[in-house]
Design a protein with these regions (language model features):
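Terminal signal-anchor or tail-anchor transmembrane helices
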Residues: 10-20, 34-60
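A gly/ser-rich beta-alpha-beta helix-loop segment of oxidoreductase catalytic cores
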Residues: 193-237, 243, 308
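Solvent-exposed alpha-helices and their adjacent loops that cap or buttress functional pockets
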Residues: 109-112, 135-136, 143-144, 151-155, ...
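Phosphate/pyrophosphate- and phosphate-bearing ligand-binding catalytic cores of soluble enzymes
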Residues: 98, 146, 150, 242-366, ...
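General beta-strand structural signal in soluble alpha/beta enzymes
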Residues: 97-99, 142-145, 152, 186-188, ...
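N-terminal, positively charged, Ser/Thr/Ala/Gly-biased leader segments
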Residues: 53-144
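Structural signature of FAD isoalloxazine-binding scaffolds in flavoprotein oxidoreductases
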Residues: 112, 118-124, 151-170, 222-253, ...
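A generic, well-ordered mixed alpha/beta core segment in the N-terminal half of proteins
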Residues: 163, 169, 177-212
Length: 396
């Protein structure tokens, strides 16, 4: 039994035994009220020890996780923390460094506990130094763009979150090759929507389909995002990356190893800092119409008012058939745990109805995975990246 189930039981019991004032006024029998109080007292006595037991169990899991984290990463929080922070403050200005920053503020899922360190570097040089520092202390790090396609643990992230976003990583340079062809150099922190609109204003075609994909250029390339079959990869020429060793490399599109909903860049943990695209001159009215149609389609099918991380699973319709049909047969449409639900109007999405948790998301994900394997022998592969420890499992 988890906290959510226990909470639901308590709420149901309260609904049964607790009456409003008007109801109590109408009950003149004092013995009836006494029996009601006695039942409530007995239930409380029984349930409180169970709640305390589960709480202790959960706290032990967190302690075990922290101990494992220190031993596996050789980062001693008592000894190395102050020293690491001092060196981090040399690299970054005060407004670029945050401690215990809530990740729910930085993800489209609106879920996530505090990151030990949250940094917003403004130069490639700073990023390199931060990575080298993390390597020196063997402290894990994760690179964040717009926070889409990401689920962060409720207890947070015991490492460094590096956000590549904002004006310093949104530079745009347009080079005219000839009358019909243009080269676009863009920073990895520019939102895909912004680049799509800029291209339209210049009457350049090739990036219409990313107009309403949340996320930055860097994240979009690494995850190889697309809408209706096309995305950034169609016009991509090359990228500039920082390797896990802190070195800068230039890679061609082929070297990026792009595949459906992923890339070699993701597998190798490369950080994209710049990208080069080739776009063609087009009719601005046609480009604008395509973008408008894309926006209408996305608003019809996708949860615009709930927190989500986009499509949660990678699904091959050609190989596996209709996902909706399988969900319908398995009673998974609108399946809900707490404040997390499979979106009714597009079952590819798992949405946060308000105060959802990462634990609730994983509970749904594990249930879907189990059902799809047992009933259809299909291995469900996550598209969304999960970081931190959830329900005792360390994801990243």
């Amino acid at each position: 039994m988890n906290f959510l189930k226990l909470k639901n039981i308590i709420l149901k019991l309260e609904n049964i035994i607790i009456f409003n004032k008007e109801t109590l006024k109408n009950k003149n029998n004092s013995s009836y009220i006494f029996r009601l109080s006695k039942i409530k007292f007995l239930l409380t006595v029984c349930l409180i020890p169970i709640f305390i037991f589960l709480l202790k169990k959960k706290m032990n899991k967190i302690k075990i996780y922290k101990n494992n984290y220190v031993s596996n990463n050789t980062f001693n929080y008592l000894k190395d923390d102050n020293e690491f922070l001092k060196k981090l403050k040399i690299i970054l200005k005060e407004e670029e460094l945050f401690e215990n920053e809530l990740m729910s503020k930085h993800t489209t899922f609106r879920i996530g506990g505090p990151a030990k360190y949250f940094v917003k570097p403004k130069t490639i040089k700073q990023i390199k130094k931060i990575i080298n520092l993390c390597n020196e202390y063997n402290l894990k790090y994760f690179v964040l763009g717009n926070g889409s396609n990401l689920l962060v643990s409720d207890i947070g992230y015991l490492g460094v979150i590096i956000q590549i976003k904002g004006d310093n990583f949104s530079n745009l340079k347009v080079i005219k090759d000839d009358e019909n062809n243009y080269t676009i150099l863009v920073g990895a922190g520019m939102p895909m929507r912004a680049l799509s609109i800029e291209s339209c204003l210049l009457s350049l075609t090739g990036l219409e389909d990313v107009v309403d994909i949340p996320g930055t250029i860097g994240g979009g390339i690494i995850m190889n995002v697309s809408f209706r079959g096309t995305g950034l990869s169609k016009s991509l020429i090359k990228v500039k990356v920082i390797t896990p060793e802190g070195k800068i490399k230039e890679l061609s599109k082929k070297e990026c190893g792009l595949y459906h909903r992923g890339s070699k860049l993701k597998d190798m943990k490369y950080i994209v800092v710049e990208a080069v695209f080739k776009l063609k001159k087009g009719d601005q009215m046609i480009i604008q119409k395509t973008m408008t149609d894309n926006t209408k389609n996305r608003y019809k099918k996708q949860p615009m008012y709930f927190g989500s991380a986009g499509c949660f699973f990678i699904w091959n319709h050609t190989e596996n058939g209709s996902l909706y049909k399988k969900y319908k047969e398995s009673n998974l449409v609108s399946y809900r745990v707490g404040n997390i639900m499979i979106y009714t109007y597009n079952i590819s999405f798992i949405v946060n109805l308000g105060k959802g948790t990462a634990s609730e998301v994983i509970e749904i994900v594990e249930y879907i995975t189990k059902i799809m394997k047992e009933k259809y022998n299909i291995e469900m592969k996550r598209e969304v990246i999960v970081i931190g420890t959830i329900n005792g499992i360390d994801y990243f």
